[in-house]
Regions:
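Residue(s) in the substrate-gating loop at a strand-loop-helix junction
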Residues: 142
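Alpha-helical segment proximal to the catalytic Tyr-Lys
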Residues: 127, 170-175
Length: 237
């Protein structure tokens, strides 16, 4: 399905990201993963095993460093012949306080890891997709982007901005054979989330692998007519 395609998956060593990496590799893509902890990438490679890991590549990269991201993605395109797919999974949650008690430092941190990383990755990848004559972008937003709650303003604002980014990309690239879509998960069924909320009904949570299959559809040939969409992937959560 994705043979000959080159994909970048940010946040690819995390629970959702690694499921996306596995799914894209299984579909035949070559996958490149930026990481901040080499041991996490080594663990990912070991868990994937051969032969899938033979099509896995990556490098240490600060996704908030514009110059470094531009250089790294240019190197990916040079080494692998281009960039066809970008999946922006990198991000993180912080909350717990109402707006009037939330420091600007926390706002900045949430904007940096959830929005800036995606903006810089899109800006660096799109020129290489244009050179290839097409591509697909999937940005991970959140249910919180459209259904806010108490004490999550900074995170929700950053994820809401991801939707605007996605819509802008779709409008700008619609005549260039490049699609841009967003997915909106809620609580994902991961060991860390189970440990953090042991009394929750975990059967209502969505497995990372299920979300990864939606990503696979969005970057595949059957989704070429879909762009600018924000797709809920939170099931009963």
């Amino acid at each position: 399905m994705l043979e000959g395609k080159v994909a970048i998956v940010t946040g690819g060593t995390g629970a959702l990201g690694s499921a996306v990496v596995q799914t894209l590799l299984d579909a035949g893509a070559t996958v490149w993963v930026p990481y901040i902890n080499p041991s996490d990438f080594d663990h990912l490679r070991q868990r994937l095993g051969a032969p899938a890991s033979s099509r896995l590549d990556g490098a240490l990269l600060d996704l908030t460093d514009e110059t470094a991201v531009q250089q790294a993605y240019a190197q990916v395109a040079s080494a692998h012949g281009g960039i066809d797919i970008l999946v922006n999974v990198a991000g993180g949650f912080a909350g717990g306080e109402p707006v009037h008690r939330t420091s600007w430092a926390l706002w900045q941190q949430q904007l940096d890891i959830n929005l800036k990383t995606a903006v810089l990755s899109c800006a660096a990848a799109v020129p290489h997709m244009l050179a290839r004559g097409g591509g697909a972008i999937v940005n991970v937003s959140s249910r919180t982007a459209t259904q806010s709650a108490r004490n999550v303003a900074a995170y929700g604002a950053a994820k809401r901005a991801i939707l605007q980014l996605t819509e802008a990309l779709a409008a700008e690239l619609r005549d260039s054979n490049i699609t841009a879509n967003a997915i909106l998960p809620s609580v994902i069924d991961t060991p860390a989330n189970r440990a953090a909320d042991p009394n929750a009904d975990h059967s209502r949570w969505v497995a990372p692998e299920a979300i990864a299959r939606v990503v696979l559809f969005l970057v595949g040939p059957d989704a070429r007519i879909i762009s600018g969409a924000a797709i809920p992937v939170y099931g009963r959560a």
